[in-house]
């Protein structure tokens, strides 16, 4: 016996019209204009919310992806630890013990303030100065600058021995025409 999903005892009766006669649900009413809802400020002005979100959160990942860690207007102010300048001999407010004791012992003063003492400033080579940190070594005319500084420092007695540059000890091939001046 065939199985009818619609178990109708009278197969001659046909179904006319829609199968389910449930009325369609009414569409929801149109949402009110946002300015009508004035009891909540954040929903009253959705177009003017900062950053498109209801709450300003500088740690929000979307905010950080837009503006970075420093915030909207960028980083301001000094970076790193705050360092206050100190007198060279420690605290001069403490009586007696190490009051005016500088790095060279108590009470000793320099003859000239701009004179560098080789015992206080042990400089083995002029190349260990700021021009070494600036990367001037081995670039163009910096060799002339270094030789001039070494010659001046040797004459002033600031350094006792100038390190030899290993680049100068290697034999360089003679290229081109070399002019020999009579002495």
From Swiss-Prot:
Q: Where is this region: Disordered?
A: 1-44, 68-137, 163-183
The name on file for this protein is Uncharacterized protein 066L
Origin species: Frog virus 3 (isolate Goorha) (FV-3)
